[in-house]
Amino acid sequence: MLPSYVLITPARDEAQFIELTIKSVVAQTVRPVKWVIVSDGSTDGTDEIVIKYAAERSWIELLRMPERPERHFAGKAHAFNAGYARVKELQYEVIGSLDGDLSFDENYFSFLLGKLVEDPELGLVGTPFANSSNKTYDFRVVGLDHVSGACQLFRRECFEEIGGYTPVKLGGVDYIALITARMKGWKTRTFTEKACLHHREMGTAEHGKLHASFRNGVKDYAFGGHPLWEMFRVIYHMKGRPLGGLFLGAGYVWAAVRRVERPIPREIVAFRRREQMQRLGKIVRGGLSKVFGAGLKQADSSSVENPQLRRGEGVLKASPAKNFPKS
């Protein structure tokens, strides 16, 4: 028997895509006990779309949050935590964070729940994502123990042990949760047999991409990234996007010179650096030529052993079913 689960979706101005996400969840063979969609000051019609579906399904709830005067990347954690307050007293065994711009097949969550049943040491699971350009993480580099923040499914004990999502203005709250889970002895794993489609294209303008690269460099320093690992990341990015790699390195150096405050405990920094050096050692021993090719975070999806990603089939077509049950 599969464990029961709840979902929380922080959403801000997701009217363009959130209906695809709702239809994907409604079509699941195993539905959540509760799904709280937290509208974080949305003004584009997101709320009205959610209300339409929630009116016929008691397990879907819209939670509206007022618009905050200060906008930063901690907003996702604040919105998630508001939703968490609505479900934490319920009976469930798994809790998931789900972005509001995804679509996936009807067995997506039953598949992940099954993986948690198979291995009691797994605390966090997920799948790869791809966007319309068929790009995803290069797991030859980041490793299959990395779980994208687009959809993270936690065993309840794991989520409570790590203290949930900690708001950090620089962002990366899902990454902090991932590292903390491993530090506390839980396994984390991405399973490439399935995938989800990430509909929103991030940083489509070149200046947006460069700004994101610089910010990622700042975040790498703030989260205690080892200088040698960062050097590898910069070189790796430059193979696909030279300017992106340069801006990544510039962000790291800028943060180091400015001594940007590190918002995570020292033990997490130390643990993260040990992991990075272990991974870098494996990459070097395995041959650098095997992993150099595409960008670190936007590698061609052929690096993932998933025929859906390689051929652009199935879930990547984002073809939601036409009829969905109302219960």
Task: Give the ranges of each region predicted by the language model.
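Short beta-strand-to-loop acidic/aromatic patch adjacent to the donor-nucleotide binding site
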Residues: 91-103
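Conserved nucleotide-sugar donor-binding
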Residues: 148-163
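Conserved donor NDP-sugar-binding/catalytic core segment of glycosyltransferases
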Residues: 103-138
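Active-site nucleotide-sugar/metal-binding loop of Leloir-type enzymes
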Residues: 77-94
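Short beta-strand/loop segment that forms part of the nucleotide-sugar
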Residues: 32-41, 63-67
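Short, acidic, metal-binding catalytic loop of nucleotide-sugar glycosyltransferases
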Residues: 23-32
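Non-catalytic, C-terminal membrane-associated alpha-helical segments of glycosyltransferases
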Residues: 211-306, 317
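A conserved acidic beta->alpha catalytic loop
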Residues: 39-48, 102
